[in-house]
Amino acid sequence: MEIHLDNYLPEYPSFVSGIRRAPDRGYSLTPAQTETALMNALRYIPVELHEKLAPEFMEELLTRGRIYGYRYRPQGDLKAKPISEYKGKCIEGKAFQVMIDNNLCFDIALYPYELVTYGETGQVCQNWMQYRLIKKYLEELTEEQTLVIESGHPLGLFHSKPDAPRVIITNSMMVGMFDNQKDWHIAAQMGVANYGQMTAGGWMYIGPQGIVHGTFNTLLNAGRKKLGIPQDKDLRGYLFVSSGLGGMSGAQPKAAVIAGAASIIAEVDASRIETRRCQGWVQHVTDDIGKAFSLADEAIRKKEPISIAFHGNIVDLLEYADKQGLSIDLLSDQTSCHAVYEGGYCPVGVTFEERTELLAHHREDFCALVDKTLKRHFEVIKRLVARGTYFFDYGNSFMKAIYDAGVHEISRNGVDEKDGFIWPSYVEDIMGPELFDYGYGPFRWVCLSGKPEDLIRTDHAAMACIDPTRRGQDMDNYNWIRDAEKNRLVVGTQARILYQDAEGRLKIALEFNRMVRDGEVGPIMLGRDHHDVSGTDSPFRETSNIRDGSNVMADMAVQCFAGNAARGMSLVALHNGGGVGIGKAINGGFCMVLDGSERVDEILRSAMIWDVMGGVARRSWARNPNAMRTSATFNENRGEQYHITLPYIPERAFIHEIVQTSLNKTV
């Protein structure tokens, strides 16, 4: 067996007009580092081609800030095909090719030519040489081998066993003292670090649908907790305002409409607005702020849902609302603030095109404008909150970016970020206590046949597995899957997102595998977002409602990754950064190919429970009440095979008295 790139020069691809391109990421290497970067890229290429490609790669590095190897990108759109159309020696090898191509197709990817799936910087891998080599490896992969991927680089095939993962991925796992944006930027330019975000580098993205259910849950529960909306009502008559219509943030208008709300979503990039308009995810587009609020006001009076895309800056929109005394019920932000100085956040007074020019030629000026805008953004939110608006950070590192811009007033303890910020994140206030602490999270699947009828069958099967009377969350999830087809959520592969707890996920997974076994549907890929109960440690998002001091620890995410590998998930991935940025999160996920076998049933029975309950156990040990109750019930129901350590809770007044008495003695 010999696997390498072929000894011929592919034709340079033609770039399709109208397809978004990533901005210049910035070149800041020393001459010695530049030489290393060039050598790193050329090590994929047969020596005979170096003379031709070295100048080409050098030009990419200087003008794009990365070596993408555009020449090695296949021509045209990389749409995911049915699994039967891929070459491979095992079903997993074929299945992962479906997932990779879906992440990079024009309908899905934010910057397809730069391998960015979503989130401004989330890449499948670093360059097109890696893409081609990964595909070759997946075609050769057998059920007794594991493919190892390190920051996009296919390290090789290694002998394993059928019950081991077929693919193990890590992305940007920086050594501690270098785990920061500056050193990562150097490593990325040199071609040794890939920002996989979550499901981009984890090969499990399902389009903006992947976050619609979570956004729907967040908005609905925000309305119940903060606006007094009854359990059986929705957000009709209320206004939600936010920003961002990209690969993740694009879920906001769709989720708001499903939840019944009127929504205005600001977006500076006209192409992203057009993408959502063509998909039917926004109903109205305007660059007139007054018209945007007028349309929303009419829908609010009629108690009808509406989605409005405002082409402009969110700060302008909010300052207008503040000056006019307009009411906003729910307010958030989903700009890519994990990459706030790399183009993820556009300064006020600057067009999207001007932002791209500033990034390329005047980066310091751009960064100064970003800081200035963040401060204005903070001030206007503060005024709106004082008038009754409920603002929540959507886990995009927005409040951390404000803090880093010099606004230490946003820090809860006035000293640092360890105790969080003055406004809650959506995990802190809503997602954590209402969903994660019970084990509910973003379970998902892809019908690898590509047949819509397979997705419909799985929708019905999943719905039959849910008891809507068990909990309020189950009723919401039942209604979600009942209406999923009607809501036209699919973009790219035939896929579905559905929040479920541990028992629900296992029940659905086993039913799906039976359906594959009995020939009712084709093979299925199971997975989840890394943004889940157990998958991610980040004090700025997923573990922001952990208050025992362990919110800065990443043991949970690493243990989840290792446990899923040990139990035989088809693919396991572990990344640095997630949705909040390098050094601010450790996150992991999995893919599990359902082939109908009894072997897969056994893996599911072990791995699906672990993947969820490891996180519930950690949340319980942090003394989260709902997680403690969930863990106690789990011990009662599954005590023969499992047992979670439960905390004893001392009285707070007793502890306070002990501490104060002891400290007073030392004064």
Predicted regions and their residues:
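Short, solvent-exposed amphipathic alpha-helical segments in soluble enzyme
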Residues: 257-259, 322-327, 348, 407-411, ...
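Core active-site phosphate/anionic-ligand binding loop and the adjoining beta-turn-alpha structural block
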Residues: 290-508
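General beta-strand structural signal in soluble alpha/beta enzymes
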Residues: 146-151, 169-170, 242, 265-266, ...
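Catalytic or ion-translocation cores adjacent to nucleophile or general acid/base/metal-coordination motifs
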Residues: 197-220, 224, 236-239, 245-303, ...
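N-terminal ligand-binding/catalytic initiation module
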Residues: 1-214, 220, 224-227, 231, ...
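Structural alpha-beta junctions
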Residues: 140-145, 260-261, 327-330, 383-390, ...
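C-terminal domain-closing interface element
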Residues: 295-304, 309-324, 328, 626-665
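Catalytic cofactor-binding cores of redox enzymes
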Residues: 100-105, 109-113, 186, 192-199, ...
